Amino acid sequence: MTLWINGDWITGQGERRRKTNPVSAEILWQGNDANAAQVAEACQVARAAFPRWARQPFAARQAIVEKFAALLEAHKAELTEVIARETGKPRWEAATEVTAMINKIAISIKAYHARTGEQKSELVDGAATLRHRPHGVLAVFGPYNFPGHLPNGHIVPALLAGNTLIFKPSELTPWTGETVIKLWERAGLPAGVLNLVQGGRETGQALSSLDDLDGLLFTGSASTGYQLHRQLSGQPEKILALEMGGNNPLIIEDVANTDAAVHLTLQSAFITAGQRCTCARRLLVKQGAQGDAFLARLVDVAGRLQPGRWDDDPQPFIGGLISAQAAQHVMEAWRQREALGGRTLLAPRKVKEGTSLLTPGIIELTGVADVPDEEVFGPLLNVWRYAHFDEAIRLANNTRFGLSCGLVSTDRAQFEQLLLEARAGIVNWNKPLTGAASTAPFGGIGASGNHRPSAWYAADYCAWPMASLESPELTLPATLSPGLDFSRREAV
């Protein structure tokens, strides 16, 4: 029984699915997808649960969410292992994901009050009050790269706001989704408030096409995000929050400390085996001896990165990709760039055929035409050389995406220029592109999203504002508008 609908664990009636570890092929989870009827049922029970949940005092909803945080803390080791085994990422990194999930609770509560909540201004003859109301029934689509943390970033603020939810994890991480939902169950969520449907494309299409949905919160690829946007076009009454990928540039302008710059680049490009939406995909390096030395050192250190199993001791910097197919896709993208005329500086290599273990790749594409503007979700870094800073900014903005951008430089004025000209929602200076704070909005422009940033701003898309002018008494104004005559006429 792998679906959770209306507080009950039930068996899916759709396609049979199993999840294996992407490195060892160990079977981790087996179950059936939700079929269209079960997806519709999840929506019906969420709709039925909505009025009571929305009318709960905020403190009551907060108490359940805080109980969930306590359960995350108590079961941190267990959830860490589930995430690591299912995604292939090392144990140390999975542990940081669970920590982020725990921290998200307090941050979301603060964001609720700062971004939404209730605000009142006294007027001479009454008050002006701003309140926020939940949308209703929302669908949450989770990704596989952070199968706990990223859905959590939608689910927690949505529940705090008073919405009821249908959660579909990535079909590549069903075990994590199920494990997290079992903690929500123990936290005491009323039946129907949060529902779990497992499945792939068919389940997702059944969910996104429901007429009775009030909105959809999505984290994933640009291609799927565009499909959802088309599917919900002509339905302005539904809230749609799209958090998509990036083809992110990192500019290396002035390298005062070569090893520090190399470390920042490794953290930007290859952490999580390159499977973060903010990962650097394009490395823009200034021409000259300093840039040459930096690239040589980068290739040297990156060439020593050996991906390993989730539980290896000592722990590796990177683990496996989500699947052997994902690793193969990275290899194909590298070969495509070589065929276009790219010069390989570090060839990616499959550590073991049939697994997702893949070493990083670096390829120079300076002067190469028709390089695809796409997000290759893995450890492949494309390099361009440039002559002057204005050219670097032009190259950085030469993408349909707009998620993250970074600069390594000792010149504050260059960073100020980048802030004015960059087309990205996250712009970092001498910090990894993959560094983002939950106390700030997270999102991008262009093909990276639809102007619904998450993290600190997630509260914004989880509730709608209601403005009121209020007075406890009805009185006639002391001064009437021109043309109004309220004088008493004597009876004839």
Curated annotation (Swiss-Prot):
It catalyses: N-succinyl-L-glutamate 5-semialdehyde + NAD(+) + H2O = N-succinyl-L-glutamate + NADH + 2 H(+). InterPro entries: Ald_DH/histidinol_DH (IPR016161), Ald_DH_C (IPR016163), Ald_DH_CS_CYS (IPR016160), Ald_DH_CS_GLU (IPR029510), Ald_DH_N (IPR016162), Aldehyde_DH_dom (IPR015590), SuccinylGlu_semiald_DH_AstD (IPR017649). Transmembrane segments: none annotated. GO terms for molecular function: succinylglutamate-semialdehyde dehydrogenase activity. GO terms for biological process: arginine catabolic process to glutamate; arginine catabolic process to succinate. The active site is at residues 243, 277. PROSITE patterns: ALDEHYDE_DEHYDR_CYS, ALDEHYDE_DEHYDR_GLU. Pathway: Amino-acid degradation; L-arginine degradation via AST pathway; L-glutamate and succinate from L-arginine: step 4/5. The keyword Repeat does not apply. The keyword Transmembrane helix does not apply. Its EC number is 1.2.1.71. CDD domains: ALDH_SGSD_AstD. NCBIfam families: arg_catab_astD, PRK09457.1. Belongs to the aldehyde dehydrogenase family. AstD subfamily. This is N-succinylglutamate 5-semialdehyde dehydrogenase.
